[in-house]
Amino acid sequence: MSKVCEICGKGPSFGNNVSHANNKTSRTWYPNLQKIKAVKNGTVRSIKVCTRCIRSGHVTKAL
């Protein structure tokens, strides 16, 4: 589960590339994950967090 945010659980989503000829090939959208050192359960850990959680303040960064 390496491409999943450890705070909100956001992971990859799936869909299709669609060309002008309406050909469809499968593709994947990944969340914008950053490795940060954050305080989780009272200890400092290196976790993968999406930028939405960082910006909205769901994570307290370690100093």
From Swiss-Prot:
One of its GO terms (molecular function) is structural constituent of ribosome. Keywords: Ribonucleoprotein, Ribosomal protein. InterPro entries: Bacterial_rp_bL28, Ribosomal_bL28, Ribosomal_bL28/bL31-like_sf, Ribosomal_bL28_bact-type, Ribosomal_bL28_sf. The keyword S-adenosyl-L-methionine does not apply. One of its GO terms (biological process) is translation. GO terms for cellular component: ribonucleoprotein complex; ribosome. NCBIfam families: L28. Belongs to the bacterial ribosomal protein bL28 family. This is Large ribosomal subunit protein bL28. It comes from Geotalea daltonii (strain DSM 22248 / JCM 15807 / FRC-32). The gene is rpmB.
